[in-house]
Amino acid sequence: MSVKIRLARRGAKKKPFYRIVAADVESPRDGKFLESVGTYDPMVEPAAIILNEERIRYWMGEGATPTTTVKSILKKQGFSSNPA
């Protein structure tokens, strides 16, 4: 099973809200996920980002790879991608 850390869209039409989740690569975008590791709300200024860094480090240590968008969110938050 290959795992990605990616965004799962929630919210209403024209008002997106995202969960940052660890999910199997074969699961649909908004489908089943293994664990929710944060949230991202782009509709507020500045964007509201909440991360569970401990769990993100755990999943990256287990071999999960973040998507490009999640990588940029983690970088904005000053998150080191090195599992330690």
Curated annotation (Swiss-Prot):
One of its GO terms (biological process) is translation. GO terms for cellular component: cytoplasm; small ribosomal subunit. Keywords: Ribonucleoprotein, Ribosomal protein. InterPro entries: Ribosomal_bS16, Ribosomal_bS16_CS, Ribosomal_bS16_dom_sf. SUPFAM superfamilies: Ribosomal protein S16. GO terms for molecular function: structural constituent of ribosome. Belongs to the bacterial ribosomal protein bS16 family. NCBIfam families: S16. This is Small ribosomal subunit protein bS16. It comes from Desulforapulum autotrophicum (strain ATCC 43914 / DSM 3382 / VKM B-1955 / HRM2) (Desulfobacterium autotrophicum).
